[in-house]
Amino acid sequence: MPEGHTLFRLAREQQAAFAGREVHVTSPQGRFAGQAELLDGRVLDEVTSYGKHLFASFGPDVVHVHLGLYGKFTSGTGLPPAPRGALRMRWEGPGEDGEGVWTDLRGATACDLITEGEVQFILDRLGPDPLRRRSDPAKAFARISRSRVPIGALLMDQAVLAGVGNVYRAEVLFRQRLSPFRPGRDVTADEWAALWADLVVLMRAGVKEGRIVTTERADRERRRGPALREDAHYVYRRQGLLCRICGTEVRTQEMVGRNLFWCPTCQAV
């Protein structure tokens, strides 16, 4: 599932391409046809994200998108390709130089037209987002510090923390040497502060680079140049391989419906 940095980057790109201009909105698949007709030809005011949610404001009407596991935006310049497959929503605009821009949405869990009040209802149910400068990590810690639930599960709860998914969960816990099985109430305030600060750095880097890289250069096989795909993570999808730090075999098991990855030595309970 795309994590928060992906939605933040998408919102920024769509803001640059479409905001302040009239947008031709269609739904070739038909599932968004009625809403698309209401929006077609209107000016897109703003595109923002919060956690794993994207919001595109056309005046008081807001397109809300949650990509889920299989959703994906594709985009380009010039004339868009002929519609094919389950194309839920298409935007077309003039672009900055008039050559034309487009973006297509397929496979999203949610693609709805909602009100500003409904946007606020969604936001009120989410925890702080490490990519939002005004987010308050104390709000998340207040819930974590009272919970018997393992921290590895709490980090995946969007009501606790917005935007973190399976990759960031595994990697930030490893980087902070925290066991994913430690109850939330046993995580100290200092440990939480360090984890939050690390998430802010990692997720901002994810926005900038367009991918998740969590390893330090000194811990990679190839230490020069950009991180290779196989060097990008410490534990995520490295089950059966040796820990980059201590040499212990990386393990995996399911937690809250997703595969968890950790080093039993570096992240001892």
What are these regions (language model features)?
Residues 1-269:
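Structured catalytic/nucleic-acid-binding cores of DNA maintenance enzymes
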